[in-house]
């Protein structure tokens, strides 16, 4: 049963929050006017899950200015819109595929982030060099499948299944398309709103990483660097990148001084 105070809309706080998030993502160039789509899971009073999701054309038609009433409440698999004004995006198949592949995932954020899309169109893995993004480990570009297609949804679902618990804090690059971020927790039902906020942090910090990794690649060609560097360590080279090797810092959070004996916490 979905309950709400008299005169109020169901899941009002969650839908209001997601509407604000859409505007912020647009303002920070974490997506373009083609938009992308964002969702997270909520549970009603009887323990039934629903998907809180942005409507189609949220950016092109409404330029990211959405009201809470325009955020959709969707019944999984039937795709019935329980509440909300607007139509369901065709990429609901992508979101459902992720949630089905790993039920611990509570949020999916798909956007067309400008700097990450540079790496996504290259077909190369994105070197992961900044401290804030090390929790993502490898940033892989998947094989190309057309947007909104069932083959794309199936491809992503297969990869989510293959990486297991790593999918609970992960980002894929969708070839020539954008990013796909998944967030959740193992052995604990993560609050969906917290999960989508974590996904927001990931898309924003990864944008900085994408730009910095690009500049480090340029510096290598100029002879100013001999590799990709992260937290004071060389973690890969242009040759590694060309070969499609994952470039990230396996020793992230460990300082270089004698005083640093413990792994620091990455937030």
Question: What is the predicted function of each stretch?
Answer:
Residues 1-267:
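Glycine-rich flexible loops
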């Amino acid at each position: 049963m979905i309950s709400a105070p008299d005169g109020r809309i169901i899941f009002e706080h969650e839908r209001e929050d997601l509407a604000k998030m859409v505007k912020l993502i647009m303002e920070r160039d974490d997506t373009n006017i083609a938009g992308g789509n964002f969702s997270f899971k909520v549970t009603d009073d009887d323990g039934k899950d629903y998907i809180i999701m942005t409507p189609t054309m949220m950016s092109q038609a409404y330029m990211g200015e959405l009201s809470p009433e325009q955020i959709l409440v969707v019944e999984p698999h039937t795709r019935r819109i329980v509440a909300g004004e607007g139509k369901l995006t065709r990429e609901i198949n992508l979101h459902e595929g992720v949630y089905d592949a790993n039920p611990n995932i509570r949020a999916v954020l798909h956007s067309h982030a400008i700097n990450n899309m540079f790496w996504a169109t290259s077909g190369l893995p994105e070197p992961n060099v900044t401290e804030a993004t090390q929790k993502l480990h490898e940033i892989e570009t998947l094989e190309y499948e057309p947007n909104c297609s069932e083959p794309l949804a199936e491809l992503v679902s297969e990869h989510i299944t293959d990486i297991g618990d790593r999918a609970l804090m992960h980002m894929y690059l969708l070839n020539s398309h954008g990013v796909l971020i998944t967030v959740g927790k193992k052995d604990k039902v993560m609050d969906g709103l917290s999960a989508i906020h974590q996904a927001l942090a990931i898309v924003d910090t990864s944008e900085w990483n994408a730009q910095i990794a690009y500049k480090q690649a340029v510096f290598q060609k100029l002879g100013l660097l001999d590799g990709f560097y992260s937290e004071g360590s060389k973690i890969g080279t242009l040759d590694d990148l060309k070969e499609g090797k994952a470039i990230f810092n396996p020793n992230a959070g460990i300082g270089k001084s004698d005083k640093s004996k413990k792994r620091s916490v990455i937030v």
